[in-house]
From Swiss-Prot:
Gene Ontology CC: one annotated term: extracellular region
Names of the cofactor(s): Cu(2+)
Name assigned to this protein: AA9 family lytic polysaccharide monooxygenase F
EC number(s) stated in the UniProt entry for this protein: 1.14.99.56
UniProt organism field: Botryotinia fuckeliana (strain B05.10)
Gene name of this polypeptide: AA9F
Amino acid sequence: MHLKTFSNLLVFVATVAAHGYVDNVTVNGILYTGYQPNSDPYYATPPPRIIRPVQGNGPITDLTLIDLQCGGYTEGGIVGSQPANLTAGPVAAGSTVSLRWTLWPDSHSGPVITYMAKCPAAGCSTYVPGTAAVWFKIQATGRIGNTTVWGDTPLKTAGNSYSYTIPSCLSAGSYIVRHEILALHAAWTYPGVQFYPSCHQIQVTGSGTSTGPSSKVAIPGVYKATDPGIVYDMYAVQPYTIPGPAVFTC
């Protein structure tokens, strides 16, 4: 069997088998259960959640959809960035936040990228960024050299866990944190790359004064179909360029 054909078969099997979403988030020692797509929509009164609703464990494959922002499914009634009814924290700038994903398939290798966007003074519970350029990247891990180790490898080897650090210089306030995995197992053409975004809301404290970089990005809009990190053959031995802006540092 030809290698590419065999790869296609593996992709199909993996696609049928499983994907994933962020199941819970630990902020300042408190574990917050995330949005549960298989049960939360059926409650008369929605449970308190810090994670914005997602359509399930499936991917977003169209870079132009608002669903790319936070994993919604607009056609199915879940808008691209429907606010959560709870905000985690308070948590000090400079702290580390831990996320736990559901089961993640071995075949779905790719980078892990985290963005933040500051909410208005009224908080995040009614804030919908839309197509405004409000997002900045705070973390990104791609392919380690030309190895088979990727940003999402810890999800397969460390109990489906991942963490990020809130920039220590950020000003106090409420933020949306957008955490995503790009699965590249079918990304040798576009459409092909699979996006698994998840957004949660946190209240940050501290004496920092930064609001992130002066130039921010819109989501959707940050990625283009022609970007090197969007179209990529992960089965080839070659470097990988993480798409999007540079990581913000204090």
